[in-house]
Amino acid sequence: MKMHISLKFLCAGLLIYVAVFAFITPLSPALLQTNLTEIKPGTHTFELVGYNSHFQSAGSNALYLINDSTLSIPCTVTQVADESHLTAEVILPNEMHSKAFAFVLNNDVDGTVFLETPLKVTDFTMNPDLARTAMPQFQHREAQFFNYPYQPIIMETIRNLMWHVPMWFTMFVLMIISFAQSIKVLMRGQRGGDDLLMPIQPERVRPHDNKAAMSAAVGLVFCVLGLITGSIWARFTWGTWWTRDPQLNGALVVFIVYASYFILRNAVTQEENKWKLSAIYNIFAFILMVVLLMILPRFTEGLHPGKSGNPAFSQYDLDSSLRTIFYPATFGFILLGYWMYHLRLRILKIEQAHENLLA
């Protein structure tokens, strides 16, 4: 069955949409760093660096040190150097409720942004009964433009989410097709109940064997792409091209297992034995892939999202702005993989027909 032309246009449209918006969409404004890490009571002047911020064009910037939703210490912005650099002053009293504070800034363009790194205060008097100064009720609005969420470690590499993860989803879909076709090979292409010792009927089995092999071949391509994009992502977030993470090692094992599937197919020359052995091997390869990539990571600790205590696709991994690109990317790559599978299958059929003519 050929892939309908409308699905091909849909695939191309989705991938063009993803390629454009995955790169042109900016990250949300954030506070990147300050030259203060630890201060004492008194008057302090400090610098604050923003990321994708609009300190200058916003006009007015409200800056506070906060401990919780009921306590704040106002800071005075003394100079705005440019869109991402400002200088401010804060006066810390001798008596306070807490020793840990965080910066929060609000303006009309960036909305409300926070500095994740806490500011530690020393040499002060702890007074839990001190009257609290409520934080001003400014509007906690979002930035005025569409953006991706800012995450301190991932930062701009969050765009790789639109490529890395959909490639693995595509691989899974193709391997499911290969798994199902391998089962049909063992069933002789009929509706079950056949004795496995009965002679194989080539006209019933060969189409399913072709589909199993070609879907696994294209799936292996996306496995390699997933490993490459994952390694690049790891380099910029974890500081290394590869780490001893259970899911990363499991993905590499999956690649080796499926690469061995094609070595097995090429090693067996007798067609009937090749069909049987390849189908049995492919079924076990799929089960191993599920165990290594979907089951074991849930019970082990590691850096990769999806581990115990580090869930994938949580509210921190995938917000509404990311979903508008991620879901089309996933569907688009799955369509691309399915399209490649059909093309590879047609090429194989032509090659086999040519061989039959020469025989």
Q: Residue ranges of each PLM-predicted region?
A:
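Immunoglobulin-like IPT/TIG beta-sandwich domains and homologous Ig-like subdomains
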Residues: 34-112
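Polytopic transmembrane helical bundles with strong interfacial aromatic enrichment
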Residues: 2-32, 115-359
